[in-house]
């Protein structure tokens, strides 16, 4: 294994690899900011542009439907132009979308801005974790590949804070500044990422062996580790291990994603089917368990629980952002020590309990007309607990796991397919939550999410093997074993 040369313990995280992953993950801060700030902006958009609940649902969810398109395009795009330039493209799209939203003279223009930004989100959510995973060593891949989700949480918290302070501005100015200010960091990132190296795995897949090896030497902890990683990637790319050329023609090999969809969807091997099931399953359950309802509609949920003033609503919502960021940061430190599987099962188990408590608290509060103090406190504690349990496991592990389980030649488009499922579920929840609460009450909606989370726990327990500490090439071999051997790797959780 590349991280355990001659039986030595893995060295500390490579600083240059960490810098690369942080810069790539900044695009996730911008996306997170949009999610957080939209929860407050919609309160004022509804009043300023005289929109109804259905229009608000469409406005919040359309970004994710467009992100679906972006994510499906991102896999092939990143295989052709590279991971780095795909991040640049994502930044430019999000910048243009932010400018349109900041202008927003009417609902159609605002909607077009959300669509443009959504395309950028789709590109970013697919490529940032893949880039980080391909830069990182196996012993620190969980840390680096979880950075995008940590940055999403930081962005959400920033959005909640901006909501609180900009809400004091005149209404027609406040919400436009909330949405438009995201154009500035998008522009900075587009230039900043150009100073970062390309993914060494992508370069080697293109036959650019010398460039790929030079970058591996920069992001590895020793020359021996770099050489071992280099040989592993060459083998995965189908390059003769004895080849010492600087550049190799990759004739007949799938270097730009040709034929990959056939291998993924039409004629997958048993191993690829198993990878697809686990990767798409974890993306499905991440949003089907209701996290977007709390993040996007937090002010409305807390209003149902009994909080009335806008200042108090935004302050309590900031608490959601603090919990999310704190526990995501904790998860980044634990992923490579505790492992993906144990954290995931603990996380989802806690979510089931918290969602049940939230459903009960909101039901009691609504039945009493929002005048039960204990029901209000229970609802706030349960919402915070739900976000905390989500953030320490299911939140970051979804992106880490799906970026590392696909074989090298299928990784970019496999990851893009996972993001597509993720965005569909995000859009489904965000575009239906208000209608759902009208049909079965807000408390009933969270009881339903608790049931989904319980199903998710069983799915993860029986189907997801541990990948902690394994190189990407070793993970590929893990999924090629028969089902009994894979289940044997799981242990007793």
UniProtKB/Swiss-Prot annotation:
> CDD domains annotated for this entry?
MFS_PLT
**A Pfam family recorded for this sequence:** Sugar_tr
Question: Mind naming one GO cellular-component term on file for this protein?
Answer: membrane
Recall the GO molecular function terms of this protein's record.
carbohydrate:proton symporter activity
Q: Where is the major localization of this protein?
A: membrane
Q: Which domain of life is it from?
A: Eukaryota
Q: Which PANTHER family match?
A: PROTON MYO-INOSITOL COTRANSPORTER, SUGAR TRANSPORTER
Q: What does this protein do?
A: Plasma membrane sugar-proton symporter.
Please give the family membership noted in the entry.
Belongs to the major facilitator superfamily. Sugar transporter (TC 2.A.1.1) family.
Q: What is this protein called?
A: Probable polyol transporter 6
């Amino acid at each position: 294994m590349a991280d355990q040369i001659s039986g030595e313990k893995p060295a500390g995280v490579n600083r240059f690899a960490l810098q690369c992953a942080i810069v790539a993950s900044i695009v996730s801060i911008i996306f997170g900011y949009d999610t957080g700030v939209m929860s407050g902006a919609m309160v004022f958009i509804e009043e300023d542009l005289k929109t109804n609940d259905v229009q608000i649902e469409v406005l919040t969810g359309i970004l994710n439907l467009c992100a679906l398109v972006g994510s499906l395009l991102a896999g092939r795009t990143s295989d052709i132009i590279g991971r780095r330039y795909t991040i640049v493209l994502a930044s430019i799209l999000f910048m243009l979308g932010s400018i349109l939203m900041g202008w927003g003279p009417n609902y159609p223009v605002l909607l077009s801005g959300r669509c443009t930004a959504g395309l950028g989100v789709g590109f970013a959510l697919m490529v940032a974790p893949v880039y980080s995973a391909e830069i990182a060593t196996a012993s620190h891949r969980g840390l680096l590949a979880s950075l995008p989700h940590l940055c999403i949480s930081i962005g959400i918290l920033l959005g909640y804070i901006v909501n609180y302070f900009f809400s004091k501005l005149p209404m027609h100015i406040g919400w436009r500044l909330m949405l438009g200010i995201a154009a500035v960091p998008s522009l900075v990132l587009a230039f900043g990422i150009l100073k970062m190296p390309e993914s060494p795995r992508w370069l080697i897949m293109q036959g650019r062996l010398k460039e790929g090896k030079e970058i591996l030497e920069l992001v590895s902890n020793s020359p021996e580790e770099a050489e071992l990683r280099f040989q592993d990637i060459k083998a995965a790319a189908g390059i003769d291990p004895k080849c010492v050329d600087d550049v190799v023609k990759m004739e007949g090999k799938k270097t730009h994603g040709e034929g990959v969809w056939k291998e993924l969807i039409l004629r997958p091997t048993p191993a690829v089917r198993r990878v697809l099931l686990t990767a798409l399953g974890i993306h499905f359950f991440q949003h089907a368990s209701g996290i977007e309802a709390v993040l996007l509609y937090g002010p409305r949920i807390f209003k149902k629980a009994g909080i009335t003033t806008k200042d108090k609503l935004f302050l309590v919502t900031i608490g959601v952002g603090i919990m999310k960021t704190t526990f995501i940061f904790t998860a980044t430190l634990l992923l490579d020590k505790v492992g993906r599987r144990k954290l995931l099962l603990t996380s989802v188990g806690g979510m089931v309990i918290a969602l049940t408590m939230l459903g009960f608290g909101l039901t009691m509060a609504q039945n009493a007309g929002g005048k039960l103090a204990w029901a209000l406190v229970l609802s706030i504690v349960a919402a915070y607990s739900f976000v905390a349990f989500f953030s320490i496991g299911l939140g970051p592990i979804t992106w880490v796991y799906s970026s590392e389980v696909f074989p090298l030649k299928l990784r970019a488009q496999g990851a893009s397919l996972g993001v597509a499922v993720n965005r569909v579920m995000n859009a489904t929840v965000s575009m239906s939550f208000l209608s759902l609460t009208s049909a079965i009450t807000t408390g009933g909606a969270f009881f339903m999410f608790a049931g989904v989370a319980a199903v998710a726990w069983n799915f993860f327990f029986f189907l997801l093997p541990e990948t902690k500490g394994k190189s990407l090439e070793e993970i590929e071999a893990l999924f090629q074993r028969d089902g009994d051997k894979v289940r044997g790797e799981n242990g007793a959780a």
